[in-house]
């Protein structure tokens, strides 16, 4: 009798603890408002056994022209189909710790540009095959004497110029030409209007002419602001404040998705007015918390939103800064 009871207990424990079974019971969660309403896709990006497919995440997301999704994790870059299955991965030493990514088509071929904070460099590699084109170490020709170089963001202008933000160290933004040759640097660390205090994320803001840089100034006081700088490195304006801890920015048309490390994602329109807030976490213990285990994830609730990207249909892919490794798909409701 005791043996039978023990067997039953073990079976029940296995069923309850089985991540795959748990995912089958999760229902989609609707979030947002108006034209920026989304449904979650439970279990998207997980392995068949229900566990995370990527391991710890502290990176970004991009989508190629075929609709495949690339997310960077500590151990490398994983490629997902739109349905959420891993179809490829880049796990060589060159692809670890990509804190931010940008994808770009050049002469009919796609390339990923990455900022590697722990490896003190930027990188460019081919999407097809993963061949490394070049790396961007600290440019000695800048004349700066830095104790540390820790790039957190990268973007590329229409003419091919590359911008690499040293967001975890000096807060200078370094400009290179399309071959990787150093051109200039601008910005400095501080809390002044034109200064940067953790220039954590950055993209090319194509909503305006001329194009400009849209920069996440994560720890500036007041916290949570986005800035515009010209492509020549001139301060333009303070775009918006009060966004918590903005980590990155991704643009589609007139809209910008802004992951906030405090457990939400904000969507702005062309006037930089908030259109929707997604995945808000009401538990202060889970906000900006890397150590939220997969068993404690809540569908439709974020904990440390770090990267995002749009696909051609307006769906969003969102990565949490997370010890278990979390990436989510949000389907646009139309």
Model-derived features: where do they sit?
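Blade-loop segments of beta-propeller domains
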Residues: 48, 74-112, 116-117, 140-142, ...
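Short loop/turn segments immediately following the C-termini of beta-strands
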Residues: 74, 117-118, 167-169, 207, ...
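Beta-strand-rich domains and repeat architectures in extracellular enzymes and scaffolds
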Residues: 42-75, 325
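Conserved beta-propeller blade signature
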Residues: 68-70, 111-113, 161-165, 212-214, ...
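Beta-rich, blade/repeat-based domains predominating
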Residues: 50-66, 94-109, 141-161, 192-212, ...
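Blade-level signature of beta-propeller repeat domains, shared across WD40, Kelch, NHL, RCC1
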Residues: 301-334
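Surface-exposed loop and turn segments in beta-propeller and other repeat-based domains
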Residues: 39-51, 91-94, 133-149, 181-197, ...
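Blade/loop signatures of beta-propeller domains
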Residues: 23-43
């Amino acid at each position: 009798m005791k043996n039978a009871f023990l067997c039953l207990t073990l079976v029940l424990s296995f069923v309850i603890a089985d991540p795959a079974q748990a995912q089958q019971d999760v229902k989609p969660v609707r979030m947002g408002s108006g034209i920026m309403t989304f449904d979650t896709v439970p279990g998207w990006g997980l392995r068949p056994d229900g566990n995370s497919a990527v391991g710890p995440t502290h990176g970004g997301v991009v989508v190629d022209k075929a609709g495949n999704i690339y997310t960077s994790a500590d151990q490398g870059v994983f490629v997902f189909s739109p349905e959420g299955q891993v179809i490829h991965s880049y796990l060589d030493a060159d692809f670890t710790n990509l804190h931010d990514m940008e994808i770009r088509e050049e002469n009919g071929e796609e390339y990923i540009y990455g900022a590697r904070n722990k490896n003190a460099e930027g990188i460019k590699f081919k999407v097809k095959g993963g061949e490394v084109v070049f790396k961007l170490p600290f440019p000695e020709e800048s004349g700066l004497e830095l104790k540390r170089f820790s790039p957190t963001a990268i973007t590329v202008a229409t003419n091919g110029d590359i911008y690499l933000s040293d967001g975890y160290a000096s807060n200078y933004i370094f400009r290179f030409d399309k071959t990787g040759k150093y051109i200039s640097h601008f910005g400095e660390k501080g809390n002044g209007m034109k200064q940067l205090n953790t220039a954590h994320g950055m993209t090319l803001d194509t909503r305006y002419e001329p194009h400009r840089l849209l920069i996440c100034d994560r720890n500036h006081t007041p916290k949570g602001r986005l800035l515009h700088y010209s492509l020549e490195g001139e301060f333009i304006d303070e775009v918006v404040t009060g966004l918590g801890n903005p980590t990155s920015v991704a643009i589609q048309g007139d809209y910008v998705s802004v992951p906030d490390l405090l457990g939400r994602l904000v969507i702005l329109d062309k006037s930089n007015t908030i259109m929707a807030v997604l995945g808000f976490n009401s538990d202060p213990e889970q906000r900006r918390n890397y150590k939220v285990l997969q068993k404690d994830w809540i569908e439709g609730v974020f904990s440390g939103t770090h990267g995002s990207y749009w696909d051609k249909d307006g769906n969003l892919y969102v990565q949490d800064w997370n010890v278990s490794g979390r990436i989510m798909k949000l389907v646009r409701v139309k």
